[in-house]
Amino acid sequence: ACNAAGLIDPVLRETPGDSAPKLDELETILDELCRLGGLKAVVFSQWTQMTELAEQRVRRLGLGSVRLHGGVPTSRRGELMDRFREDDAVQVFLSTDAGGVGLNLQNAAVLINLDIPWNPAVLDQRIARVHRLGQRQKVQAILLVAPASYEEHVLNLVQGKRHLFDNVVDPEATEDVVGVSK
């Protein structure tokens, strides 16, 4: 329910995107950075339904988009990436983590994460799709996290994992880092 209450609440199910503060925030960000600022953005979510709801908000702004998810045949994925890269009218690339590997999306300047993966490497991989060799723009990576939520707890766990990993592989790390693990 951190993403959109209508995804699980039967009362709100007919219009799940209407009860979604995250989508409201996404719409505000895309309006400012893409519609008014002319930038291209990549929006990641772990959930296909969430990318569908986000796509509705993108259309409402009058922005062009493409959407990649696990159900898109491999033969069509290159076409979607080409449209995003080459068509100035396509400003938003929506993707599940099915699009996390092998995507080269450095023509975007904005990366928006609608949810936080448990594995910090997945988050890094999402960012690497945009911030990579050939990138000529400053990249803005945005995490949309519901405050005081389970999701915020997951973010804290992910940050703890990252801290632990960084200190385990750092030759200068101290032994007290072991205490981070619970």
Predicted regions located by residue number:
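SF2 helicase/translocase ATPase core recognition
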Residues: 64, 76, 80, 91-179
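Conserved Helicase C-terminal RecA-like lobe
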Residues: 1-93, 97-101, 172-182
